[in-house]
A protein has these predicted regions:
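Bacterial Sec-dependent N-terminal signal peptides
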Residues: 1-20
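Histidine-/acidic-rich catalytic cores in large beta-rich domains
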Residues: 18-173
């Protein structure tokens, strides 16, 4: 009876911890891209971030439950990805050590879809800013109490000082 109990106790772990890769390379000719491929497939069950070489061999495979969006080599030749737990961007060296973390300033939350780490050490991030806006002043029948999303672009230097900020709202009024 104890063995059955232990089996049922650990069964979900064995079922949901499987992170088998689910891809097939069907064509790989000499004209194919000859570089590593970085990706993370999202969804349930949790899937790993993966680096594949051009032959399809896994070079890196690790499950990061709340991290890994936009997993790529950036312009500064470092690996970057978004962390959903902290709402910021992580920067890794070639040994997969986190060497920096970057967040939007002035109360904004970085968007998880794109991040530019420049060669000069600067970072560019995007954020959204929701504001009430009387859309009935723009279009006939518009909602006078609409919530409209504006865009924020921030550039931070290597010390995370704000050196540039653009707000789409500055161009609405």
């Amino acid at each position: 009876m104890r063995v059955i109990f232990i089996l049922f106790l650990y069964l979900p772990y064995f079922i949901f911890s499987q992170n088998e890769t689910d891809y097939n390379i069907t064509i790989n000719t000499g004209e194919a891209w000859d570089a590593n491929i970085f990706y993370k497939k999202t969804g349930t069950p949790l899937r790993p971030v993966i680096i594949l070489n051009s032959s399809g061999e896994e070079l890196f495979h690790e499950v990061w439950p709340m991290q890994g969006n936009d997993f790529k080599i950036n312009d500064n030749n470092k690996i970057t990805f978004y962390d959903l737990e902290t709402d910021g961007w992580m920067v890794m060296d070639s040994l997969h050590n986190i060497v920096d973390s970057v967040y939007c300033l002035n109360g904004y939350v970085a968007d998880p879809h794109d991040f530019i780490a420049l060669e000069n050490g600067h970072y560019i991030m995007f954020a959204y800013d929701q504001q009430p806006y009387a859309m009935d002043t723009i279009v006939e029948g518009g909602d006078p109490e609409a919530i409209v999303e504006g865009l924020i672009i921030q550039e931070l230097d290597a010390d995370h000082n704000l050196v540039f900020e653009w707000k789409s709202w500055d161009h609405f009024h």
